Amino acid sequence: MKKLMMIGFGAMAAEVYAHLPQDLQLKWIVVPSRSIEKVQSQVSSDIQVISDIEQCDGTPDYVIEVAGQAAVKEHAQKVLAKGWTIGLISVGTLADSEFLVQLKQTAEKNDAHLHLLAGAIAGIDGISAAKEGGLQKVTYKGCKSPKSWKGSYAEQLVDLDHVSEPTVFFTGTAREAAMKFPANANVAATIALAGLGMDETMVELTVDPTINKNKHTIVAEGGFGQMTIELVGVPLPSNPKTSTLAALSVIRACRNSVEAIQI
């Protein structure tokens, strides 16, 4: 039985916990110290809830982060320094190029691995493959309901309470999007890191009051030809800012960690 460490225990983490593969046992959950008692009451007593990686009393076979950018900054480097493998869902954190370099160096030094999970989008394998053959242009378009943009930088750019038609409120690079919309733009960062990079991948963000689902579109072209990928995703009922597919992406990564044949 392989052992899992989970960083974070919010809506997405709870979904992942409920659907873990049978051959993977959750043994450690890392949360802020103020949340330890609450989280411990929600999970089995044989799961150790801790506030710091150094408090772990064993060696996890896989670590997943489902806690947001602040948690990545706090814990990811410690995980890699121990030689462990970690999967990140909050890929937008890596818009900080200096931090990305630090993680890469730590992983290389300690024979550790950093997995960037696909999250709420499809086609990352295709973008990554196209990069090998002369990827020239990539644009990501994200469209969500006003409710899904609440609490983000979008509130400073458009009146979410009174928008009456689809409205583009941001156009810029993936790096700019990831820094300004940390809770919403992990998809843009993932596409960028799979392809042309944070400064060459363009992003267009839209609010649409007529929809209640998240729409993601990738348009790419290069030596391989042309590619258009469109996905309409359902948000998690417990958190409208989180894609159900993003949670499923984490579950898939957990399953891959225990399976001999991986897709």
UniProtKB/Swiss-Prot annotation:
**Key word Repeat present in the record?**
no
Q: Per its UniProt entry, what is the enzyme's top EC class, as one word?
A: oxidoreductase
**Swiss-Prot/TrEMBL keywords:** NAD, NADP, Oxidoreductase, Pyridine nucleotide biosynthesis
Claim: Glycoprotein is one of the keywords in the record = no
> Which Gene Ontology terms describe the biological processes this protein takes part in?
NAD biosynthetic process
- Cite the active-site annotation: H216
Query: Pathway, according to UniProt?
Result: Cofactor biosynthesis; NAD(+) biosynthesis; iminoaspartate from L-aspartate (dehydrogenase route): step 1/1
One GO MF term on file is: aspartate dehydrogenase activity
Under InterPro entries, the record lists: Asp/hSer_DH_NAD-bd, Asp_DH, Asp_DH_prok, L-Asp_DH, NAD(P)-bd_dom_sf
Amino-acid positions noted as binding NAD(+) in the UniProt annotation, renumbered to this chain: A120, N186
Give the reactions, separated by semicolons, that this protein catalyses.
Answer: L-aspartate + NADP(+) + H2O = oxaloacetate + NH4(+) + NADPH + H(+); L-aspartate + NAD(+) + H2O = oxaloacetate + NH4(+) + NADH + H(+)
Biological role stated in the UniProt entry: Specifically catalyzes the NAD or NADP-dependent dehydrogenation of L-aspartate to iminoaspartate.
Q: Which HAMAP family match?
A: NadX
| Family per record | Belongs to the L-aspartate dehydrogenase family.
Q: What is noted besides the main data?
A: The iminoaspartate product is unstable in aqueous solution and can decompose to oxaloacetate and ammonia.
Name recorded for this polypeptide: L-aspartate dehydrogenase
Species whose genome carries this gene: Acinetobacter baumannii (strain ATCC 17978 / DSM 105126 / CIP 53.77 / LMG 1025 / NCDC KC755 / 5377)
Which gene codes for it? Answer: nadX
